[in-house]
Amino acid sequence: MKVAIVEYGVGNLNSVYRAVKHLGHEPVVTDDPSELHDADAVILPGVGNFRAAAEKLEETGLCDEIRELLGSVPLLGICLGMQLLMESSEESPESRGLGVFRGTCVALPNDVKTPHMGWNTVEFRTEEFREFDGEMFYFVHSYRVAPEDDVVLGETEYGERFPSVIGDRGRLIYGMQFHPEKSGPVGLKLLGEVLTGASR
C-alpha cells in the first residue's frame, strides 16, 4: 500500500514516514501534486503556522489536487494537517484552509498553558474506534478545530472539551489533533486502522 506524505514545509515528516514504514506500507514524501494520484492513502502531517502551510499548499497546487482526491482514497490530517481541513483559523484569519469541513480553528482557552503539550486521553464517540476509547495520545498544539458540521469522532479535555478527532467515513477523511505516530503502540494501531480500515 503506497502512502503519500505531503511535504509542504512543516515538521514531523520523519516520524510519520517511520510510522508508515513500521506498519508495513510504502511511504512516499512528496510535494508533487501528480504523485498523489498514485497513492492508496494520503497523510497531511504538520507542526507549524497555519498561514505558511496554507500558502505553500496553494502555491504548489496541492490544494486543488487534495480536493480532487476527496472520497477516492483515505485522507488523514495530523495536528496542523487536521486544522488545514477547516475553512480558516484565528491564527491567520486572512488565510484559507482546504475547506474540507465547514468551520474554523480557535485558540485554546487563556487559562491553560499553551501549547498543550504531552499525553492526554481521547474519548471516542464512534463504535469505529471504540477500542481506543480512553487511551493516551501525544499532543502539541495551541489551536483547536471548531467544526460546524457533525464530524466530531473524539474529544479531549484541556481547559475545555475540544474535538481531537474528526472525520467523515463516507468520504474517507479523518483528522487527529494529536500525533498518532508519536503515541506508541496504541497510536500506531490507530494510524493503521485509519489507513487500511477507511479504504475497506
Swiss-Prot record:
The keyword Glycosyltransferase does not apply. GO terms for cellular component: cytoplasm. GO terms for molecular function: glutaminase activity; imidazoleglycerol-phosphate synthase activity; lyase activity. It comes from the Archaea. Pfam families: GATase. Keywords: Amino-acid biosynthesis, Cytoplasm, Glutamine amidotransferase, Histidine biosynthesis, Hydrolase, Lyase. Residues 2-200 form the Glutamine amidotransferase type-1 domain. Its EC number is 4.3.2.10, 3.5.1.2. GO terms for biological process: L-histidine biosynthetic process. It is found in: Cytoplasm. Pathway: Amino-acid biosynthesis; L-histidine biosynthesis; L-histidine from 5-phospho-alpha-D-ribose 1-diphosphate: step 5/9. It catalyses: 5-[(5-phospho-1-deoxy-D-ribulos-1-ylimino)methylamino]-1-(5-phospho-beta-D-ribosyl)imidazole-4-carboxamide + L-glutamine = D-erythro-1-(imidazol-4-yl)glycerol 3-phosphate + 5-amino-1-(5-phospho-beta-D-ribosyl)imidazole-4-carboxamide + L-glutamate + H(+); L-glutamine + H2O = L-glutamate + NH4(+). PROSITE patterns: GATASE_TYPE_1. The active site is at C79 (nucleophile), H179, E181. IGPS catalyzes the conversion of PRFAR and glutamine to IGP, AICAR and glutamate. The HisH subunit catalyzes the hydrolysis of glutamine to glutamate and ammonia as part of the synthesis of IGP and AICAR. The resulting ammonia molecule is channeled to the active site of HisF. HAMAP family: HisH. Heterodimer of HisH and HisF. This is Imidazole glycerol phosphate synthase subunit HisH. The gene is hisH.
